[in-house]
């Protein structure tokens, strides 16, 4: 049965792609050539096309005064690279079957933060009863004994209970509230249901936005996102991808079951390649669409280039950031095979608790205070700017608070005086500032640093990697090695030189290839060339959020005792003022975001641990006393070298 192209796309289940369509009728006559978004396309009656994907071409946004109703909505296009951070508002329109949910939502086991729904009534299964209103997480869709089933789970008493639901399962399923914060890119990729709009709340920014802000000045509120889709298709005898708007006035007929799809290009994305079985590699492919911003030193990923995809793999990288006082830092992924040599740089510690975490049995931690702190207890030490300490270990002590003895956690140190040393006990809750004094002159390779020291760790490249033509790390004055992460890669090479391979990151390189044939050459040993990869602010943010999501967050520092009764120092007051800030890394609009989320508990845990002190660090660097102390320390370090 013939349908308009728009009707067909509306009813299309994306899990069934690709689909082969025959053009039935429309305003496009045989032999006519039309310009469609930069691609010439002949859509004559009887023409056959293969739809490979449905992508969001652009996002239209409408500002709402309230989530429930809009007042004088003004629609505007939101740039796809807009660095806003958003909280998703749960959709109030129910889904009536599980099939409707799976057609509209992205459900993949590889995706974090799986979609969650609740049912208006109890669902009785063979071995389990899903209670009314209970949060159901949809993990994946797969065929079981010839029937398509949805793998689900519910969390009870900190334990997951798994079960399956058929696509035919009926009822009123409502979307659950989602407390996570998302970038616009994440929402576009997998948080906008097909054929629906998405209401979100702008909470902050992940990076500085140099272009004109499309939102009103100071706006933080509800926005309706309306996607405009484009169809990605291939045609016989063409090697490029055709992009068509679903609103194109033609009628089509689905002939997938009666047509040999092998007549078309087998076009695969980077993600499609990674999802192939291991036994299908190595394969030969031709690059159809090359990635933008390709960092490979050779033109290996150019359109028309024939490459060998040897296998898929995972590799460890060190996530590093440039040490700078402002927010516009550069970020890198450094392979563990990097041959450059590093020398240590002083670390900064915003609290005494950070000193306790950073101390090492390998060597005593020597620091200089950059902030003054007055202790309200005789049993605990006060600190002046310029005081030097050797950090030893944590210990408890009794203090007298309003006539009542209380046990407090402290950090045992040695205070270095001019001709002697004295014992000092710093309160762990102390919100101060310290800079490390480096005595170690040794040069380290990155593998040695990761093995001998706890990350994060500050370094500088002293000897560049001579095996790299252009070592981009050599010109960076200071780097913070933040954490070791594991990324997914495709190992590829030029067909003309299959022994020299390169790693292509699956999540950060978007390319399209056409499969040619299986590779019949020698699949023995080959040389893998790894690069230092510079990543964008958004990519850095996503890595920090998801690559370590399976780890528990670090323990929280001790709280100041009896805050209401004890006279607060300016430092502790500053700490209180920042305790409920929204956890959006490098957020530009702090005050407004704080008001928006001041009553939401648990938001801290949704943010990369390394980003939580950014605001405090920036505030700290503004204070003149600390800046002076830091300058003196670095001068001392340079003099020693």
Curated annotation (Swiss-Prot):
What are the subcellular locations of this protein? Cytoplasm; Nucleus
Write out the ranges of the annotated region (CABIT 1): 1-259
Instruction: Please classify the protein's predominant subcellular localization into one broad category.
Output: cytoplasm
Task: Specify one Pfam family.
Answer: CABIT
Q: Which GO terms describe its biological process?
A: adaptive immune response; negative T cell selection; positive T cell selection; T cell receptor signaling pathway
Q: How is it modified after translation?
A: Phosphorylated on Tyr residues quickly after TCR stimulation.
Give me the ranges of the annotated region CABIT 2: 260-518
Modification Phosphoserine occurs at: 584
GO CC field: cell-cell junction; COP9 signalosome; cytoplasm; nucleus
Q: Which UniProt keywords apply?
A: Adaptive immunity, Cytoplasm, Developmental protein, Immunity, Nucleus, Phosphoprotein
**Is Phosphoprotein tagged as a keyword?**
yes
Quaternary structure per UniProt?
Interacts with PLCG1, ITK, GRB2, and LAT.
Instruction: Tell me the protein family, please.
Output: Belongs to the themis family.
User: What's this chain's function?
Assistant: Plays a central role in late thymocyte development by controlling both positive and negative T-cell selection. Required to sustain and/or integrate signals required for proper lineage commitment and maturation of T-cells. Regulates T-cell development through T-cell antigen receptor (TCR) signaling and in particular through the regulation of calcium influx and phosphorylation of Erk.
Q: What is this protein called?
A: Protein THEMIS
Source organism: Bos taurus
């Amino acid at each position: 049965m013939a349908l308009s192209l728009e009707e067909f796309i509306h009813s299309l289940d994306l899990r069934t792609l690709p689909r082969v369509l025959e053009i039935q009728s429309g305003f496009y006559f045989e032999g006519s050539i039309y310009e469609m978004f930069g691609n010439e396309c002949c859509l004559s009656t009887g023409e056959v096309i293969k739809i490979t994907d449905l992508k969001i071409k652009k996002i239209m946004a409408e500002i709402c005064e309230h989530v429930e109703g809009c007042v004088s909505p003004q629609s505007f296009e939101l740039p796809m690279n807009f660095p806003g951070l958003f909280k998703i508002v749960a959709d109030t329109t129910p889904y009536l079957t599980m099939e409707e949910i799976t057609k509209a939502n992205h459900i993949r086991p590889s995706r974090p933060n799986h979609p969650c729904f609740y049912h208006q009534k109890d669902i009785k299964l063979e071995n389990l009863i899903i209670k009314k209103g209970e949060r159901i997480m949809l993990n994946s869709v797969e065929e079981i004994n010839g029937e398509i089933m949805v793998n689900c789970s519910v969390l009870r008493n900190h334990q997951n209970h798994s079960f399956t639901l058929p696509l035919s399962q009926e009822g009123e399923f409502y979307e659950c509230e989602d407390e996570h914060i998302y970038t616009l890119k994440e929402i576009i990729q997998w948080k906008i249901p097909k054929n629906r709009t998405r209401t979100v709340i702008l909470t902050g920014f992940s990076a500085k936005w140099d272009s004109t802000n499309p939102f009103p000045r100071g706006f933080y509120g509800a926005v309706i996102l309306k996607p405009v889709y484009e169809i990605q298709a291939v045609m016989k005898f063409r090697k490029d991808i055709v992009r068509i708007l679903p609103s194109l006035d033609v009628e089509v007929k689905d002939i997938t079951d009666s047509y040999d799809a092998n007549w078309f290009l087998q076009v695969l994305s980077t993600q499609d390649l990674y999802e192939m079985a291991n036994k299908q590699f190595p394969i030969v492919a031709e690059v159809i669409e090359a990635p933008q911003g390709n960092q490979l030193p050779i033109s290996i990923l150019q359109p028309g280039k024939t490459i060998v995809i040897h296998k898929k793999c995972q590799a460890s990288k060190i996530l590093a950031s440039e040490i700078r006082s402002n927010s516009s830092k550069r970020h890198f992924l450094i392979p563990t095979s990097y041959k450059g040599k590093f020398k240590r740089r002083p670390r900064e510690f915003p609290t005494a608790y950070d000193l306790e975490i950073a101390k090492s049995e390998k060597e005593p931690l020597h620091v200089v205070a950059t902030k003054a702190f007055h202790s309200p207890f005789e049993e605990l030490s006060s600190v002046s700017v310029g005081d030097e300490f050797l950090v030893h270990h944590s210990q408890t002590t009794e203090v007298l608070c309003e006539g009542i003895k209380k046990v407090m956690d402290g950090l045992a140190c040695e205070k270095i005086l001019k001709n002697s040393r004295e014992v000092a006990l710093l309160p762990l809750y102390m919100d101060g500032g310290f800079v490390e004094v480096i005595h170690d002159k040794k040069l380290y390779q990155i593998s040695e640093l990761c093995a001998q020291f706890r990350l994060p760790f500050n370094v500088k490249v002293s000897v560049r990697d001579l095996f790299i033509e252009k070592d981009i790390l050599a010109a960076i004055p200071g780097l913070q090695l933040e954490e070791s992460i594991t990324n997914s890669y495709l190992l590829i090479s030029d067909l003309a030189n299959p022994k020299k391979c390169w790693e292509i990151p699956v999540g950060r390189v978007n390319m399209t290839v056409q499969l040619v044939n299986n590779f019949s050459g020698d699949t023995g040993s080959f040389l893998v060339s790894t690069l230092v990869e510079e990543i964008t602010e958004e990519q850095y943010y996503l890595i920090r959020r998801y690559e370590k999501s399976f780890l528990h967050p670090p323990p929280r520092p001790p709280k100041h005792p009896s805050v209401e009764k004890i006279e607060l120092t300016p430092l502790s007051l500053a700490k209180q003022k920042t305790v409920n800030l929204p956890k959006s890394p490098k957020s530009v609009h702090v005050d407004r975001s704080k008001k928006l989320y001041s009553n939401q508990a648990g938001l801290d845990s949704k943010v990369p641990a390394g980003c939580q002190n950014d605001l405090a660090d920036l505030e700290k660097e503004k204070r003149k006393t600390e800046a002076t102390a830091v300058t003196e320390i670095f001068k001392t370090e340079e003099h020693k070298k």
